[in-house]
Swiss-Prot record:
GO BP annotations listed: coenzyme A biosynthetic process
Lineage: Archaea, Methanobacteriati, Methanobacteriota, Stenosarchaea group, Halobacteria
Organism for this UniProt entry: Haloarcula marismortui (strain ATCC 43049 / DSM 3752 / JCM 8966 / VKM B-1809) (Halobacterium marismortui)
This protein's pathway: Cofactor biosynthesis; coenzyme A biosynthesis
Name used for this protein in its record: GTP-dependent dephospho-CoA kinase
GO molecular function term, any single one: GTP binding
Pfam families cross-referenced by the UniProt entry: DUF359 (PF04019)
């Protein structure tokens, strides 16, 4: 059984629809504006970055997009990482394993693919909190494009507020991703 640290309450879901940054439909334009390192959350975002010639420093994938399996060619293209870590993370949750693996991936000098059994969507929040200054977290905004979230104080404050309003132990979640 997964060690769930935080769970998304239904009354908070609407706030997650508001993007944490600018929305892009052009990968090259996004990459021109992105900081370093780049953390990708989602299969399609990871695929588009790789296809544009930029393997993310850390990518979190679950082999699904908008609740359907990704195409075989997309899954096959998500390759070329120095290492792969696998974790369980049920939908609408953040588990201790996912949070610890996120921190591990950020601390590594190797590109890391975090293969999530379950759902990786909420990982955007702790990724913004945990990433170093100047980093960018890229994630998908359904039917709109890719969001480029800068890891600055404004974004971190918003993310911390969201995590603190989730059900569970926000202090533990924040501690697991802090360095």
């Amino acid at each position: 059984m997964s060690d769930v640290v935080l769970e998304l309450p239904s009354d908070l879901r609407h706030e997650l629809k508001e993007p944490l940054g600018r929305i892009y439909t052009d990968t090259a334009a996004l990459l021109a504006d992105a900081g370093d390192p780049i953390i990708a959350v989602g299969d399609m975002v990871t695929y588009h970055l790789i296809e544009a010639g930029r393997t993310p420093d850390l990518a979190l994938v679950d082999e699904r997009t908008e609740r359907s399996a990704v195409d075989a060619d997309v899954a096959a293209a998500i390759d070329g990482f120095d290492r792969t870590l696998s974790v369980d993370n049920p939908a609408a949750t953040l588990t201790a394993d996912l949070l610890a693996a996120l921190r591990d991936g950020l601390d590594s000098d190797e590109t890391t693919l975090l293969d999530v059994d379950g759902e990786e969507d909420l990982a955007t929040l702790p990724a913004v909190l945990a990433a170093p200054a100047g980093a960018s977290v890229v994630y998908g905004q359904p039917d709109e494009g890719m969001v480029l979230a800068d890891c600055d104080d404004t974004a971190r404050d918003r993310v911390r507020s969201l995590l603190e309003r989730m059900d569970g132990d926000a202090e533990r979640a924040i501690a697991l991703v802090s360095n």
